[in-house]
UniProtKB/Swiss-Prot annotation:
Enzyme class: lyase
Catalytic activity: GTP + AH2 + S-adenosyl-L-methionine = (8S)-3',8-cyclo-7,8-dihydroguanosine 5'-triphosphate + 5'-deoxyadenosine + L-methionine + A + H(+)
Cofactor notes: Binds 2 [4Fe-4S] clusters. Binds 1 [4Fe-4S] cluster coordinated with 3 cysteines and an exchangeable S-adenosyl-L-methionine and 1 [4Fe-4S] cluster coordinated with 3 cysteines and the GTP-derived substrate.
Binding site for GTP: 14, 64, 95, 155, 254-256
Pfam families documented for this protein: Fer4_12, Mob_synth_C, Radical_SAM
Protein name as catalogued: GTP 3',8-cyclase
Binding site for [4Fe-4S] cluster 2: 249, 252, 266
Signal peptide: none
Naturally occurring in which organism (per UniProt): Helicobacter pylori (strain J99 / ATCC 700824) (Campylobacter pylori J99)
Phylogenetic classification of the source organism: Bacteria, Pseudomonadati, Campylobacterota, Epsilonproteobacteria, Campylobacterales
Length: 321
């Protein structure tokens, strides 16, 4: 079992398999050239697999595959299948923009993926183009429908931005509710790569908009997890991830392995342990030592409200968001 200095059990690891992405979203990397990562030096997935086997043996119960856009990484199906074969009890989930999901959904399901989280920030093609700099809505919606067809579980993630998509909160909720998919609204998380371009809505503002149409009956906050779950009068549940309004540091159970081999104990924490050499060499003892050291290094709280260091300079697409 992995336990940090504040007696939190760490049983969830987010793994970025690439920094590359075919979107340039306003809230992530809006000004990064599309060919910026063409020379990215990727960690071999078989080596990453060995690191994750160690993490599983030490008590990790959930692995999320992220990026960048993870569906751009070649050999992903096989990687997931090997992870699933190693321990079928571990939940394997993936976050994606959905652009390539239609052609990959069945392969991901067959490989053993438990669930896919799809970013859906608008149901209007022109807005998706404005937000992501990609004419992508048709592909993303088709990917969602194909996932439902093949039986792959889904959640939707929406970053709510003032004057951009905040007038679609109810429409997006209806879209998700009609398909029995949970949607999670996310407060915009500032980073130096998108800080000045976007203003987000806070949790209360999102709830006020939903309450204009629906009666919200109650809220529950899972012991572990980043989202609060709200229940409507008709029984439908949606989530809000509100790190600004109410951080979840006290119950945080996760660390991150970035695509460059750094183990990051917190998304909003600059210090990371470089495990690249150990992973490349498949040095089991060193990988285990560095994993445990990263758990010890995990801070009690993020630095969100620290005026001297609250906005991270490490982009989220490096650490997997």
């Amino acid at each position: 079992m992995l336990v940090d200095s504040f007696n939190r059990v760490i049983d969830y690891i987010r793994v970025s398999v690439t920094k590359q992405c075919n979107f340039r979203c306003q809230y992530c990397m809006p000004t990064t050239p599309l060919d910026f990562f063409d020379d990215e030096e990727l960690l071999p997935l078989d080596n990453v697999l060995e690191f994750l086997k160690i993490a599983i043996d030490e008590g990790v119960k959930k692995i999320r595959i992220t990026g960048g856009e993870p569906l751009l990484r070649k050999g992903l199906d096989e990687f997931i299948a090997k992870l699933h074969a190693y321990n079928k009890e571990v939940a394997l989930v993936l976050s994606t923009n959905g652009f390539s999901l239609k052609k990959m959904a069945k392969g991901l399901k067959d490989a053993g993926l438990s669930r896919v989280n799809v970013s859906l920030d608008s149901l209007k093609s022109d807005r998706v183009l404005k937000i992501s700099q990609k004419d992508a809505l048709k592909n993303t919606l088709e990917g969602i429908e194909e996932s439902l067809k093949v039986g792959l579980k889904l959640k939707l993630n929406t970053v709510v931005m003032k004057g951009v998509n905040d007038d679609e909160i109810l429409e997006l909720l209806e879209y998700a509710k009609n398909r029995s998919i949970q949607i999670r609204y996310i407060e915009f998380m500032e980073n130096t790569h998108a800080k000045s371009l976007v203003k987000g809505l806070k949790e209360k503002e999102i709830l006020d908009l939903i309450a204009q149409k629906y009666k919200i009956m109650g809220m529950e906050k899972p012991k572990q997890g980043s989202s609060k779950i709200y229940t409507l009068e008709n029984g439908y549940q949606f989530g809000i991830i509100a790190p600004h309004s109410d951080d979840f540091c006290q119950s945080c159970n996760r660390i991150r392995l970035a695509s460059d081999g750094k183990i990051c104990p917190c998304l909003y924490y600059q210090d990371a342990i470089d495990a690249k050499e150990a992973i490349i060499n498949k040095d089991t003892k060193m990988m285990k030592r560095l994993l445990k050291q990263s758990i010890i290094n995990k801070p009690e709280k993020n630095m969100w409200n620290d005026k001297n260091g609250g906005t991270p300079t490490r982009a989220f697409y490096y650490t997997g968001g």
